[in-house]
Amino acid sequence: MREYFPNGVNGALSVNGEGLCHTIELPWRDNQHAISCIPEGRYELAKRFSPKLRWHLLLKAVPERDLILIHPYNDAEKEAQGCIAPVTTITGEGKGDNSRIVFEKLKAFVYPVLERGEKVILVISQKSKVESHKWKKISRE
């Protein structure tokens, strides 16, 4: 679920209604390449490897965009090019902390599902004003 702000987008990632982590993204700038978050919608996830980012997640079939990833970063304006980062805590608009830690936990959750040949669908939508979440404590081991 997303909340839109002038300097970034803050969100919450949940699985079957159970809070998993927060997310940060660039602000909405009409889906412009490398400077905007992506449109709300349903996106299938896939495993992807690159020498720079190592193993991460790819969002398939994003309208008018390519290589939209979920990977660790802590400041969308400085580090993102339209991708999504999981974070443990939101520290500002499009900013958070401990992204690498929570990203490893996210991969540990998603990768086994993908390796079984099952689909994982990410649904991106705007947070309603009455939305509430149950949050799991994410340990920093």
Question: What feature does the model see in each segment?
Answer:
Residues 1-121, 126:
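Cell wall/extracellular polymer interaction/catalysis modules
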Residues 126-141:
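Short, basic, low-complexity termini and linkers enriched in Ser/Thr/Gly/Pro
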